[in-house]
Amino acid sequence: HPLIVTNTGIRQGADSLRFQLTVWKNMMPGPSKDRSIQLSLDVISEGLDLTPLSLDSVHVDFQRPMNATWRVRFSAPSEKRDGIWTYGALGKGLLWSGTGSIRAKIFGRYDGRPFVHDAWTGRIQITH
């Protein structure tokens, strides 16, 4: 099951961007250590022009109980369509069972100005 979390992004006066991050598991057969995750980043404009927006990378931290942490960097989006950036996962062994926490940062530029959006912190539950 994907985890979908929506947060508010850049604010410029009354205009803003909203980021909707969807994380899902790679359910290809095989050992769990060879599986990975993917995400799509849906950018919803709330009165802000999307033309000057470019997204460079998304850094996602997964934290399990017992302080076991995985970090994965999503960069070079494989697809950009209608304000949706799709990223493939880098890294292995990211599929686990149980409940943990997840944190994401979005790196990009708007109108040539760099920004880092500490997007969201949430809980994720993976059942199988």
Regions found by a protein language model. Name each.
Residues H1-I4, L41, A76:
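Short intrinsically disordered, low-complexity coil segments enriched in acidic
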Residues H1-R18:
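A eukaryote-biased signal for short, well-structured alpha-helical docking elements
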Residues N7, L21, L55-S57:
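A structural signal for short, hydrophobic beta-strand segments that form beta-sheets
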Residues L17-S45, T51-P52:
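Contiguous beta-strand segments within globular domains
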Residues I44-L50, R64-D118:
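Short, solvent-exposed, Trp/other aromatic-anchored flexible loops in extracytoplasmic proteins
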Residues L53-R64:
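Short acidic, flexible loop segments centered on an aromatic residue
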Residues P114-H128:
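Short beta-strand elements
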